[in-house]
Every structure is written in structure tokens, then in C-alpha cells.
Amino acid sequence: QTIPEQTIPEQTIPEQTISVPFNQKSGSNNSFQDNGDFYLVFDETENYKVYEDWVKGWDPIENQGTFFENQIMYLNENFKLPYDVPIIIAECGESNAWYYSETNPSYSEIVICYELIDEINQFQIWSYQEDYDLAYEELTDEDWEYIGYQVLDTVDFVLYHELGHAFIDLYNLPITGLEENVADQFAAFILLETGVEEDVSIYVINAANFWLTSSEILEIDESNYSDVHGFDRQRFYNLACYAYGSNSQF
């Protein structure tokens, strides 16, 4: 038998126009209204005053302004908000960071705790000492400078992780998988796309190092299995994959 040749009718896919709420403000033609800005709030701290000057200090990456002020400037130049959203640096009583929102009236905030900044600092110091077999008193000014960059990159990652949660909520963005993973992906993307170093993967690698160190120091208990986050070592390997994808020579 001869099977007659079949002609598959050509399909025409209609052109789709996607309106993205977070494209550049200048020249934007989408319908998302820009009715607010991010702004900084530095709460007083009793137990972590050593970090007050650090969080308000000079930005060594941009070499101008302060780190958090530069982030606010970038965010307000590139993202639209339905209302003002504070980014709060505060003493919280726990090592944490979070995005919080409520309705009636609409309110959102991002909080980064001094306790988390302290934990990041301590973990990165421990990791550096382990990597180079150095005692604390043997660390040089050059060592401390490098550790400072590792801490700053990790705090930067935490900030954009929480911003990932904020944008998912404020823009009602559809996502697949765990929201915590998506927030990690957003943070990694921003650091890889906006970094000023020749090898931008170093930003994500420094942040990933914190999760690797955390997995080596902290013990896993039953609560970790019900946590909304993946295990710290899982987060490390995910970030390492993102960095490798941006630069296979990292």
C-alpha cells in the first residue's frame, strides 16, 4: 500500500505583546503605574553597633556613595512600585531577613537583621581561615579586605533575594516551583547582570560560599525538612550552577 502524502496546514502563531512591569522607567510604555519608591530605614541597635558604620559606610564596589544608598538609587531608577516600600536594617532578636506585606491599607517592607549580617561576617571569617589555614590573629589587612567583599556580596544577595519575593508579590508574577528558589534565582540574575567586576560570577560565588559554610557549621534537625528554603548545601550548589552558567571558567 502507498500511504498518501499528508500536508500539514501551516499554523500562524499570533504575535503576543507582553507588558513587563519592571523595565526601565525612562521611555517605558507599559501600563504599570509608578506611584512609589524604595527608601532606607536604619533602626537603632544596642548589640550590633559595630556594624552601624559598616552598613552606612562607603561602597567599595561602586567606589562612591554608600552600599545601601546605591542599591536604592538603582532600584528606583529601574523598577516601578505601586506605593513606597521601606528597606529596614534592624536588630531583630534572630538571624534573619524577610519580606512582609499586608492589605487594607497596602503596605510592604523588607527587613535585613543585624544578627544575619553578624552571622554572615562570622561564617565568612571562619571559612577564610579554614581555606588558608590561618589563625584569627594572622589575618592581614588584605585578608580582611577580601573577607569584607565576601560579606558585602552575601548581604547584596540577601537583599535581592528578598526583593525577589517583593516583586513576585507586588507585580503578581506567575512562577513555577518553590518561591524561595525563584527568589534565589532572581538574586543571582541581578548580581550576574549588574556586577562591575570583570568576572561577575565572583559575586554569586561569594554568596554561595556562605551557604556552603553554613551547611558545614550548622547541624540539620527535623525542622529543616519542613522549612520553606532548601537545605543550605542545596542552595550552594544551585548558586554554583548559576555562576558556572554565566562563566564556565569561574
Range-by-range predicted roles:
Residues 1, 6, 11, 16, ...:
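Intrinsically disordered, low-complexity repeat/linker tracts enriched for polar/charged residues
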Residues 17-127, 141-144:
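A metal-dependent hydrolase signature that marks the N-terminal structural subdomain at the beginning
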Residues 78, 166, 190-193:
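Short alpha-helical functional segments enriched in proximate histidine and acidic residues
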Residues 83-98, 184-185, 200-216:
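Acidic helix-start/capping segments at beta-turn-to-alpha-helix junctions
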Residues 127, 145, 163-173:
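Substrate-binding clefts and substrate-entry loops adjacent to catalytic sites
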Residues 148-168:
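Short alpha-helix carrying the canonical HExxH Zn2+-binding catalytic motif
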Residues 176-195:
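An active-site-proximal "capping" alpha-helix that borders the catalytic cofactor pocket
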Residues 193-250:
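Long, well-structured alpha-helical subdomains associated
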